[in-house]
Amino acid sequence: MIIAIDGPSASGKSSIARELGVRLNYKFISSGHLYRIITLIAQRSLMNSCDFISEDSLLNLILENDISFNNFAFLLNGENVENQILNDKIDFQVSFYSSYVGIRNIVNKKLREVVKFSDDNYIIEGRDITTVVFPESEFKIYLDASVKVRALRRYKQRNGNETLEELERTLKRRDDVDKKKQYGKLKLSKGVFYLDTSYKGLDDVCNIIIEKFNLKKVRER
């Protein structure tokens, strides 16, 4: 069983997916973490982490590194780098690198391989998860929230250098990039359960989703 969660950046996908995983005893995967790890690989290869590298160069770098999945996390060369990928510098570049078709193909293949060779149930979150990666998943969710709310959430999560206004601009720019991507653009898929989380807490959102999920299972019996 796969529960797929889609939606824009900072809409609550990761927090909600993690909590649902605990409540439902499902394994949690974030495709966004994979793209962030790849962005970290790119940044480590450059003298100036604000520069960008070409798609071909990045594809070659990925081959030189080992990205694996273990205990609910993607590892880079055996190291859990989560504390190195959730920052403003990664935020600024990840949407650029995730627009490379070759990079998206690698990430999508990696995600499908993890699920294919496992008998576990999964909650997988990320942009285009419901439309491209797992469009056939049994339960599809699209989480949304206003830009102001999403910026405030990210501001509270981070101790970075960006102001609230700068975060709003960053999220608007990223939304624009994600919605205009040639491949894997951000959009609603057919049969998705849409939920605006702007003024809902984590518990409320999870309760709504679980109620909808259980109702769906009853109807399909």
Swiss-Prot record:
UniProt cross-references to HAMAP family, sorted A to Z: Cytidyl_kinase_type1
This protein's name: Cytidylate kinase 1
Organismal lineage: Bacteria, Pseudomonadati, Spirochaetota, Spirochaetia, Spirochaetales
Family: Belongs to the cytidylate kinase family. Type 1 subfamily.
InterPro entries: Cytidylate_kin (IPR003136), Cytidylate_kinase_dom (IPR011994), P-loop_NTPase (IPR027417)
One GO MF term: ATP binding
GO biological processes: pyrimidine nucleotide metabolic process
Location(s), subcellular: Cytoplasm
Gene3D superfamilies assigned to the protein according to its UniProt record, in alphabetical order: P-loop containing nucleotide triphosphate hydrolases
SUPFAM superfamilies membership: P-loop containing nucleoside triphosphate hydrolases (SSF52540)
GO CC terms of this entry: cytoplasm
Binding residues annotated for ATP, in chain numbering: 7-15
Stretches that traverse the bilayer: none
Alphabetized UniProt keyword annotations: ATP-binding, Cytoplasm, Kinase, Nucleotide-binding, Transferase
Pfam families: Cytidylate_kin
Catalytic activities: CMP + ATP = CDP + ADP; dCMP + ATP = dCDP + ADP
EC number: 2.7.4.25
